């Protein structure tokens, strides 16, 4: 369903090691909004919910709710760092168009 690069796995592990709240994975949710119609919402989570797909890779879990699953099927998640910023990059084959910011799609 979702592929995580080594860089994304390392970023998730780092975030999990820094949180004060109990968490063992990353939740990816697709919500209406953004420049192109949909946007990604990311957060740390500690458990799966009814209907979630749970992807395990490199010792981390990714939770995806049932409504978001069709939007992210086949997606690759990467993490990049640059001079001005760092963040997750989404290579989503379901996106017909992407916003220049890289955080929303349609």
Swiss-Prot record:
Keywords of the record, alphabetical order, are: Plasmid
Parts of the chain that traverse the membrane: none
Q: Which PANTHER family match?
A: IRON-SULFUR CLUSTER ASSEMBLY 2 HOMOLOG, MITOCHONDRIAL (PTHR43011:SF1)
Query: Which superkingdom?
Result: Bacteria
| The protein's name in its UniProt record | Uncharacterized protein y4vC
Per the UniProt record, one Pfam family is Fe-S_biosyn
Family indicated by similarity: Belongs to the HesB/IscA family.
Q: Which GO terms describe its biological process?
A: iron-sulfur cluster assembly
| An example Gene Ontology molecular-function term | iron ion binding
